Design a protein with these regions (language model features):
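Secretory targeting signatures
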Residues: 1-26
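Primarily the HKD phosphodiesterase
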Residues: 17-18, 56-115
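Ser/Thr/Pro/Gly-rich low-complexity linker/stalk segments immediately outside membranes or between
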Residues: 26-42
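Second-shell loop/turn segments in exported
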Residues: 40-45, 66-69, 92-96, 155-159
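A general structural motif
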Residues: 44-50, 71-74
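N-terminal post-signal-peptidase region of extra-cytosolic proteins
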Residues: 47, 51-53, 115-121
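DNA replication sliding-clamp ring fold and its partner-interaction surfaces
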Residues: 50-53, 57-64, 168-169, 173
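HKD (HxKxxxxD) catalytic microenvironment of the phospholipase D
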Residues: 65, 117-173
Length: 182
């Protein structure tokens, strides 16, 4: 084998070894690598697994989960947020002021020690449906975190893998958070 072929073979083996190490690292640490260009996932309901997708990404959080949610009644998503909080993840949620009673998960999250605020927009509602995870992942769409959205309504959920998009959503989250009541 000549030197050129040997160099190419060593290079290819090195690439494969690096890819395998990356996969193993991801599997064992639960950490994911940010793609170089934005990518996304699209989900639909009813019965499209939107709630499972939200729970999956909450479970992958390593640092922070910031949520702006109009209506939030899904127990499994609340439990996933509590589990993340118990793992030491910073969890903050802003609810619309009209949605903190009744079937809302507000009381459960508050009793678990999660930082909560009520939007104080005097001229309308806080109609966002957004979660920002680790400043890298944005979950958004028409999907309220409710049983109706999961099982009855025609809804959409988009998971955006983009530091730039997450930064823009995080800026809006911080703006609303700073103007909300705790």
């Amino acid at each position: 084998m000549n030197d050129r072929k040997l160099i190419i073979a060593v290079f290819v083996v090195g690439l494969l070894f690096g890819a395998i190490l990356g996969i193993v690292y991801s599997m064992y640490t639960g950490r994911y690598l940010q793609p170089s260009s934005p990518s996304y996932e699209i989900h639909f309901s009813p019965n499209g697994g939107c709630a499972d997708t939200i729970v999956f990404w909450i479970g992958r959080a390593n640092q922070s989960i910031h949520v702006l949610m109009y209506i939030f009644t899904l127990q499994n998503v609340a439990e996933a947020l509590i589990s993340a909080h118990d793992r030491g993840i910073e969890v903050k949620v802003v609810f619309d002021k009209s949605q903190i009673a009744g079937y809302s998960q507000y009381a459960l999250l508050k009793s678990a020690g999660i930082e909560l605020r009520n939007d104080t927009n005097p001229s309308g509602i806080m109609h966002n449906k957004v979660a920002i995870i680790d400043n890298r992942i944005v979950i958004t769409g028409s999907f309220n975190w409710t049983n109706s959205a999961e099982n009855s309504n025609n809804e959409n959920l988009i998971v955006i893998h983009s530091v730039d998009a997450a930064s823009r959503y995080e800026s809006e989250f911080q703006n609303i958070w700073s103007q909300s009541q705790g």
